[in-house]
A protein has these predicted regions:
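Short, structured beta-strand/loop micro-motifs enriched in basic residues and often containing a Trp
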Residues: 197, 211-223
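Short, charged beta-turn/beta-strand-edge "cap" motif at the junction between a beta-strand
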Residues: 16, 219-224, 242-247
Length: 265
């Protein structure tokens, strides 16, 4: 699917314990949320037609390219949802219509001194990864197909497969379905440029109000290997969404399973 004209956004802090494990709680110390388990905010990782570094299309498929300098980079295993954006007459977002979902690697550099989340998210071609297929969303609320899906991830290093993120049901997201949608709409309209966050309404304006958004809705907590090991060149990354009624958390292929596979270069 061609996403070069789609604004791409991510959600920070939508799974319990992820920010603590990633060492990023300090970045959000001055961000006040309405309730304790609310995500911290949203951030851009691709802005179509932008002249900034975020204007480079960074989403890859089978290759994850690390920067040419020494970095500490981690897989961030996520679900990405493709939404249609509905605006009112004054270009405020009034609805998000969920169409399809897939797996996503929101690979992140643990970068000291970064002022914005986006500075850790995009550094060149193949900074990100997206799954090998899309699953149509029948309804973005409880009772739909996404109720049955789990998200898991692995890194294969030197022939040994290690769980990287915990195996988590999508219903384990802190904010999901209507609660997430309403929160996203609010943040797209009202989030200010403050601390590590950015003014998303301004980005929508600068991108000429795109009709769709790819939103990566948050990374799972890390398994032990993922928490304590950064990526190395030659690693093989798997981010898998599977229907727990039919599939297992493995590399076998099925019509209901989405597998993102990347080799780290």
């Amino acid at each position: 699917m061609q996403l070069k004209y789609v604004i791409c956004l991510g959600v920070a802090g939508n799974f319990a314990h992820h920010l603590e494990q990633a060492g990023e709680l300090e970045d959000f110390k001055n961000i006040v949320t309405d309730v304790e388990d609310a995500p911290k905010g949203i951030f851009p990782f691709y802005l179509p037609a932008s002249d900034s570094f975020l204007g480079l299309y960074s989403i890859g498929t089978d290759t994850l390219t690390l920067p040419p300098y020494e970095v500490n980079a981690q897989v961030e295993p996520e679900i990405a949802v493709l939404f249609d954006i509905v605006y009112n007459d004054v270009n405020e977002v009034v609805d998000l219509k969920a169409n399809q979902f897939t797996t996503f690697n929101d690979c992140t550099i643990r970068k000291e001194g970064a002022k914005k989340i986006s500075e850790k998210k995009s550094w060149g071609l193949n900074s990100k990864g997206i799954g090998n297929k899309w699953i149509s969303i029948d309804t973005f609320e409880e009772g739909g197909i996404m109720d049955n899906y789990h998200l898991c991830s692995f890194v294969k290093r030197d022939g040994v497969v290690h769980p990287y993120g915990v195996d988590a049901p999508l219903l384990g997201y802190s904010y999901f379905y209507t609660k997430l949608k309403n929160w996203l709409i609010d943040k797209m309209n009202t989030q200010e440029d403050f601390g590590p966050l950015e003014n998303i309404a301004m980005h929508l304006n600068d991108c000429n109000y795109p009709s769709q958004a790819l939103i990566s809705i948050g990374a799972t907590a890390y398994a032990e290997f993922g928490e304590h090991n950064y990526l190395q060149r030659g690693d093989e990354v798997y981010v898998i969404a599977y229907d727990s009624r039919y599939d297992d958390a493995d590399f076998s292929v099925s019509s209901t399973k989405v597998i993102l596979y990347q080799v780290v270069r």
